[in-house]
Each structure stands twice: as structure tokens, then as C-alpha cells.
Swiss-Prot record:
The keyword Ribonucleoprotein applies. This is Large ribosomal subunit protein bL35. Keywords: Ribonucleoprotein, Ribosomal protein. One of its GO terms (molecular function) is structural constituent of ribosome. It comes from Thermotoga petrophila (strain ATCC BAA-488 / DSM 13995 / JCM 10881 / RKU-1). Belongs to the bacterial ribosomal protein bL35 family.
Amino acid sequence: MPKMKTNRSAAKRFRITKNGKIMRNHAYRSHKTGKKRRNTLRELRKKDVVSSTDKYRILRLLGKK
């Protein structure tokens, strides 16, 4: 059976850590940031861990499962 292709859009959005967590960027940061608080924008800069319910689906998109 051939290898499963990696979904390229998912590969650009998600990173897998050494511990197996999947990290993602926050939304709501690309434009219209003038009305958002500075603290909010700073928090949105950080990475976030993908929830366990979505983890298996993303791993399949990345060709890891």
C-alpha cells in the first residue's frame, strides 16, 4: 500500500512537539488589530495546544497515523 500524502495546508499550520503535542497559532490576529487590547494581541501571539478531540484528525492530515 502506498504512503499517505501529507495535507500541505495542515503541515503549514501545525507543528508536533517531541512529546507528541500538536501546536497551533491563534486566530483573530491577521487584521483589524487596532481595536484589540495590547494584552490580547500579546496572548494571541503565543502558540496553543490542539484539543485531544481534534488530535487524531490532524495526525491523519499530517500522515502520521
